[in-house]
């Protein structure tokens, strides 16, 4: 992808959304019956779209909220539904729509007091803490399109295990929501917001303080405080600003929030690689503001708007997410003595093979799963996975005692873990990675995209290993051709080809007419580029007939 000529530069007035217009479009524009682009598509990250594109409007959210209310009733979930929202412009009207429908369905709802914002991990944690006490089970809804641009909206559902809903649940919600849309919302129960707030079904609580105080159960906050590290946080205008403020105060940390603005245009952002405003804390372009301040701090952090992702900045720059995952795993499994010896590491099959080498050295079991955090939920929930992480800078891990903290991605604990590592060892995570690279080799990793039609994407997701005729990759014998994940046998929706010195994986994009290729080599950049070239050839050959 070509880099935009203003990538990494501050946003200008001409880059900003018109919040009033976008909000009006939420209420005025309607999805067109029979138009697939306007339908509800409920993946594990929920449904995402934009009001301007007729894909995230009031009818969508009313239908989704009704479908969730029916699904939880069908499954006997009668406890509270924790509803959180992030700072995107469309999150506010969608939040109102959800409350109107849930209250009309007699669902008890818990929201952050004073109309505050709630990160994804705080919703997951609240669900788990509530359900541990026994009694009627709680679940949750988070209104967020994650790191997507300011014009986008999103909504996702977390069942009582606290994690992202599995496909069998999301398919039911999607189908029912689309049926309600097709029927003109006739089956949707709804009362006004005033009636909802007066119904007794909507309860306001402070969800911030219990989360902040609970952090001592999962991260060595005392060590961070004692070390006196200078920490910087750029909340990127997201849902966790109040959380970072209270963390600094409660644990008496030397923590500076470099920008505490909430602005639905996200005008304080630097433009991403493609020139868009995108709150991606793993992008050097989007993180240019915090990177310019890196010499002022021992460590600096950022999160995306719903705080399920992390960005770690050392004086050397922004850490590669794959590199930090390897460091986090290496540290945690040597500093959590209460975790049993059978506790495993979960990784997605497009994450770096450096993780494989670290886990093997630790003598731990590695469970490699398809892309998507949903594959880690059960393992984190029952304590059989100590850690689960994705190359897209999303991860979670267990408390000190081996019980779950958040079964969804938690950007806050991953940032604080970087501080713990630095405080306890005297070396920051980048320095730890440099040591791992000396021991295990320094892999060269890249992800690229190539255009693909819908038919080609469908063909790629249905590949079988024998359809790959090549016997070598970049000069090395192919040791494995995978279309199912080795950790759980689930389809990977694509292909992974491995050698002793490198690998590539190809899978269709869930949101664009393209497929993604992930490549890695332990023999350097030139070797990786050869893998990339041959990967494109292998995939093109397979797709030629599609």
Swiss-Prot record:
Keywords: Carbohydrate metabolism, Cytoplasm, Glucose metabolism, Isomerase, Magnesium, Metal-binding, Phosphoprotein. This enzyme participates in both the breakdown and synthesis of glucose. Its EC number is 5.4.2.2. This is Phosphoglucomutase. The active site is at 146 (phosphoserine intermediate). It is an enzyme of class 5 (isomerase). It is found in: Cytoplasm. It catalyses: alpha-D-glucose 1-phosphate = alpha-D-glucose 6-phosphate. Optimum pH is 9. Its cofactor is Mg(2+). It comes from the Bacteria. Belongs to the phosphohexose mutase family. InterPro entries: A-D-PHexomutase_a/b/a-I (IPR005844), A-D-PHexomutase_a/b/a-I/II/III (IPR016055), A-D-PHexomutase_a/b/a-II (IPR005845), A-D-PHexomutase_a/b/a-III (IPR005846), A-D-PHexomutase_C (IPR005843), A-D-PHexomutase_C_sf (IPR036900), A-D-PHexomutase_CS (IPR016066), PGM (IPR045244). The keyword Metal-binding applies. Mg(2+) binds at residues 146, 304, 306, 308. It comes from Escherichia coli (strain K12). One of its GO terms (molecular function) is magnesium ion binding. Binds 1 Mg(2+) ion per subunit. The keyword Magnesium applies. Its main location: cytoplasm. Substrate binds at residues 146-147, 156, 308-309, 390-392, 409. One of its GO terms (biological process) is carbohydrate metabolic process.
